[in-house]
Amino acid sequence: MRNLVRTLFRPSPAFVERAKRGQALVEFSLAIIPFLVLLMGVIDLGRGIYTMNGTSEAAREITRVTIVHLTDGSGNIGFSTETTDTIATQVGLVPGLKINATTDITCVDEYDAVVADKDCRPGSDFIRVHVSAPFAPITPIVSMFGSHTFESTSRMQIP
């Protein structure tokens, strides 16, 4: 009798195989969610580091070009062709990079006091460039902490 009950209620091999596939599907659906959250977090971290490094590099590059090509010929600092080309390149490389050549590129003295463009002297004065770029995470959990604006200032002496 006992063997008869085992034989009658033994699941068929096809049923066992379907049950295993269903179990794998449930396990996959439970494991994919934390994996995707971690993956998106790593992508957000990479985007944040890229934006932060990009703003820093953009400020330095614009400053380097501006100290070599100081004015546009009419005495306006930061409006030379080379500087405007560099600004356009950096704006294309860093998403959302903001720089206003009129207010963000200034001539300063050794105490960081602003000097008028016409009074800017090579050898003793400096060029200061300030740039900023907004960053908003795309991962919902990370975006709960809000967005951030990366800012960078570079200062180099005019040769």
Please describe what each predicted stretch is.
Residues R2-A88:
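Alpha-helical assembly-interface signal, strongest on the long, hydrophobic N-terminal helix that forms
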Residues P11, D112-S124, H148-P159:
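A short, hydrophobic/aromatic-rich structural module that often spans a beta strand
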Residues P11, I32, L93, S132-I138:
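Selective for proline/serine-rich intrinsically disordered segments
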